[in-house]
Amino acid sequence: MDNTKKYIVSLDSGTTSCRTIIFDQNGNMVSSAQTEFTQYFPQSGWVEHDAIEIWTTQLGTLQSAKSRANIKSHNMAAIGITNQRETVVLWDKETGLPVYNAIVWQDRRTSEYCDELIKQGKANIISSKTGLIINPYFSGTKIRWILKNVPEAAQKLQEHKLLAGTIDTWLIWKLTDGKVHATDVTNASRTMLYNINTLEWDQEILDLLEIPREILPVVKSSSELYGTINPKYLSQRATAAVPIMGVAGDQQSSLFGQLCTEPGMVKNTYGTGCFTLINTGERAIFSKNKLVTTIAWKLGNQKPIYALEGSVFIAGSGIKWLRDSIKVIYNAQECDFYCGLADQEPQNVYMVPSFTGLGAPYWDSSSRGAIFGLERGTKREHIVKATIEAIAFQSNDLLSAMQKDIGKKINIMKVDGGASNSNYLMQFQSSISDVTIMRPTNIETTALGAAYLAGSASGFWKSIDELKKLNPIDKSFRPGLSKEVVNKKLKGWQEAVKRTFNWTNSI
């Protein structure tokens, strides 16, 4: 490997695994490493991660990817970090040890408290300041829960030893040996504590949730110098201090990675969940259709770019459920085969995968998963197909809400994430939503976005125009079903979703 050549390193800390991908000047993957980590479900509706395991897993992938690429620390121009959003960690700043497991974005334990806030009439205050709705999905009520329910957290707070942050903040703090306690605007905008108009932690909301400002990180742009990694984390002989220069939450990172840099451009990521974002430019559009307003990114001293976002909680994790829980598939790659098989004996089976409630545009944390339309002749392929179609139906719900908010039709949607590899899903999505689907050559655009942000700040790449040449479209999908068939399918889906509403409150 050329000893003088430079690379960008992207750390991608996801919901189920950590990855490191190393990119060259042409945006090509030089090497990668990925390792899954443990999911904990201590009670119904609770989801936790071990923050130390996330740290050691992420570090392990960094070292593995570096070793596979056969590069030295001085070959690394910069590091970008992207992460699962909303998931929070609270830790002792002296020992570096968490006071409790990380509470994951899927966790619903604060549902009752969120209902209380809504009954108190706080919904408008929260939405007008943060762009979000009151929901256990977001970080704020999770932080409050730890402060109220974990004695060690209260004790460390009293001793002024407590720090809090999302996963990006935790990794930055660990990589810099506790020198930097910071986050970026995109992650801050998902906490339900950050004012997206003033670009500051909102004191009124902090007081409402009883969260002291002192435990929260400094908020920086998505593309600037955060600090440098201790060389010991790269190798025993490493001496070069590699800068962290790009940070963004996974979905905003994906939007940037897809180069949706103009207002009106849309992307959908098919990962653990599904996340559809539309760039709205320098203007924050507040949704009338239960989408959330978020910061897409902020490049250095430039004004922030905003986005409308819809979130689906279960997408790829529904496929994982097919594989791991009910064991009807051996791996995700089999799904297209079974969908094709189901088409030979069609049935009207609908799967609503609301295992942890419904996200946008329903926001029903009491909904639970259900399968409708089962017959004596229903086979595994019909269940698989219904699960795949549910991903597209949920994404279509988001697109429909988005089109109402912006007042015009969306014609093109860029896609990425693991499940976008499914040609069956992409074709069905195109047909059901009446959009052209564009899938790039490299679908790892979340990691690519963090690389672009770090590379832009470090001068590795000089302009957006230069970036646009790096990841061409690999395949496009165009609508292929009649309007009559589409309307019938959508009617069945809407009926199925409706029947899952308010489930946990009614039994």
Curated annotation (Swiss-Prot):
EC number(s) from the headed UniProt entry: 2.7.1.30
Activity regulation comment: Inhibited by fructose 1,6-bisphosphate (FBP).
Entry binding sites for sn-glycerol 3-phosphate: 15, 85-86, 137, 250
Reaction catalysis annotation: glycerol + ATP = sn-glycerol 3-phosphate + ADP + H(+)
GO annotation, cellular component aspect: cytosol
PROSITE patterns in alphabetical order: FGGY_KINASES_1, FGGY_KINASES_2
Classification via InterPro entries: ATPase_NBD, Carb_kinase_FGGY, Carb_kinase_FGGY_CS, FGGY_C, FGGY_N, Glycerol_kin
Residues reported in the UniProt entry to bind glycerol: 85-86, 137, 250-251
Binding residues for ADP: 15, 19, 272, 316, 418
Pfam families named in the record: FGGY_C, FGGY_N
Free-text function comment from the UniProt entry: Key enzyme in the regulation of glycerol uptake and metabolism. Catalyzes the phosphorylation of glycerol to yield sn-glycerol 3-phosphate.
Protein name per UniProt: Glycerol kinase
Organism from which the protein derives: Malacoplasma penetrans (strain HF-2)
Source species taxonomy: Bacteria, Bacillati, Mycoplasmatota, Mycoplasmoidales, Mycoplasmoidaceae
